[in-house]
């Protein structure tokens, strides 16, 4: 399935049904009076946040959405049927903007609903205009037009941990080894072309991790593929920065990613960050110790290590402990995108 995280959609809600102008016509009743019913309301277009969908791919094939019109009122004071609403599931984390780019709403919780286009109200039948001074009104009102607009949908993935790093740092391998993610893995840059989600289970606690495609220098300007996905990091509670320990200059690798985060948004650099030296099975213990010390001196942070053989439970437990401890982090809705 393609990963679509932006879409421009035309919405047209249903028109309200017209009111009816009619009079009661029955045998032996000379002046039956007005009996025109109201028109039905037009159908609305509603978005609902759901864990059953992970991308906006629906809108790739459905860029124009039109709801049903309301039915006109009938004689004998019968109301017209209302048009059926259209309810569309979108991923949790979907933001809705107007055509000018102003944020309208942010669907960031399960089953959160938003009426994106309101259906028109049904017209009023002539029976409703009957008064003591006007016993036989002939006028009625037409149904109102439904809302009609262009909107822009943008998806920002919600996860506990955002995995960042240069291309080929081993982010996908790490995600696959500790979660049920089926991400593609290969020994060349930009293997991951779209964000991948995985769920790890530690001591009956769920941890959602997002593998953000590799960033390179200039990503915030559009170089590589990272600029498209930097926005997804904004929704991650904490960051796990994975660095390939076989690189000659690991400090430069670290600084490169931090610079791109800073140039995109200062808020990203203020997120809690954990650093993981990866592929440690490719170096001897002395080399690893030297690189850990250099990185720790530069970042003033504890450096964790990982390899193919080493269990990931330790670092995952630390991540969960931090999320549970820090009350300032709002833990997002947890779901398993591979078990729906």
Curated annotation (Swiss-Prot):
Its cellular-component GO annotations read:
cytoplasm
Q: Report the Gene3D superfamilies cross-referenced here.
A: GTP1/OBG domain (2.70.210.12), P-loop containing nucleotide triphosphate hydrolases (3.40.50.300)
Q: Which residues form the Obg domain?
A: 1-158
Cite the GO molecular-function annotations of the record.
GTP binding; GTPase activity; magnesium ion binding
What the entry lists under NCBIfam families is as follows: Obg_CgtA, PRK12297.1, PRK12299.1
Query: For this protein, what is the EC number?
Result: 3.6.5.-
Q: Does the keyword Nucleus apply?
A: no
**UniProt entry tagged with the keyword Nucleotide-binding:** yes
The UniProt subunit note reads as follows: Monomer.
Which cofactors does this protein require? Mg(2+)
Q: Where does GTP bind?
A: 165-172, 190-194, 211-214, 278-281, 306-308
* Task of the protein: An essential GTPase which binds GTP, GDP and possibly (p)ppGpp with moderate affinity, with high nucleotide exchange rates and a fairly low GTP hydrolysis rate. Plays a role in control of the cell cycle, stress response, ribosome biogenesis and in those bacteria that undergo differentiation, in morphogenesis control.
* Disulphide-bridged cysteine pairs: none
Q: Which InterPro entries match?
A: G_OBG (IPR031167), GTP-bd (IPR006073), GTP-bd_Obg/CgtA (IPR014100), GTP1_OBG_dom (IPR006169), GTP1_OBG_dom_sf (IPR036726), OBG_GTPase (IPR045086), P-loop_NTPase (IPR027417)
The UniProt entry, under CDD domains, shows: Obg
The family assignment reads:
Belongs to the TRAFAC class OBG-HflX-like GTPase superfamily. OBG GTPase family.
**Name of the protein:** GTPase Obg
- SUPFAM superfamilies, per this entry? Obg GTP-binding protein N-terminal domain, P-loop containing nucleoside triphosphate hydrolases
OBG-type G domain: residues covered: 159-325
Binding positions for Mg(2+)? 172, 192
**Any Pfam family hit:** MMR_HSR1
A Gene Ontology biological process noted in the UniProt record is:
ribosome biogenesis
Q: Where in the cell is it found?
A: Cytoplasm
């Amino acid at each position: 399935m393609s990963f679509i995280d932006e879409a421009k959609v035309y919405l047209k809600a249903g028109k309200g049904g017209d009111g009816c102008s009619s009079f009661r016509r029955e045998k032996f009743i000379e002046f039956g009076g007005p009996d025109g019913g109201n028109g039905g309301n037009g159908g609305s277009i509603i978005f609902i946040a759901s864990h059953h969908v992970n991308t906006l791919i629906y809108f790739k094939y459905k860029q124009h959405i039109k709801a049903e019109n309301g039915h006109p009122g009938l004689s004998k004071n019968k109301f017209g049927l209302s048009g059926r609403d259209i309810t569309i599931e979108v991923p949790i984390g979907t933001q809705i903007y107007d055509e000018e780019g102003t944020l309208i709403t942010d669907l960031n919780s399960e089953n959160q609903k938003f009426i994106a286009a309101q259906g028109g109200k049904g017209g009023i039948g002539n029976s409703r205009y009957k008064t003591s001074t006007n016993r036989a009104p002939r006028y009625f009102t037409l149904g109102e037009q439904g809302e009609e607009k262009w909107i822009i949908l943008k998806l920002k993935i919600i996860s506990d941990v955002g995995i960042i790093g240069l291309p080929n740092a081993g982010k996908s391998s790490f995600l696959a080894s500790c979660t049920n993610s089926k991400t593609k893995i290969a020994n060349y840059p930009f293997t991951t072309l779209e964000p991948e989600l995985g769920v790890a289970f530690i001591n009956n606690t769920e941890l959602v991790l997002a593998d953000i495609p590799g960033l390179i220098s200039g990503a915030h300007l559009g170089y590589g593929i990272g600029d498209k996905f930097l926005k997804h990091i904004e929704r991650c509670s904490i960051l796990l920065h994975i660095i390939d320990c076989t690189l000659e200059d690991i400090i430069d690798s670290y600084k490169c990613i931090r610079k791109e985060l800073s140039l995109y948004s200062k808020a990203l650099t203020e997120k809690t960050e954990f650093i993981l030296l990866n592929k440690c099975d490719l170096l001897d213990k002395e080399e690893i110790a030297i690189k850990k010390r250099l990185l720790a001196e530069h970042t003033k942070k504890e450096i964790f290590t990982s390899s193919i053989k080493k269990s990931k439970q330790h670092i995952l437990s630390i991540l969960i402990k931090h999320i549970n401890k820090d009350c300032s982090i709002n833990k997002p809705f947890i779901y398993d995108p591979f078990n729906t």
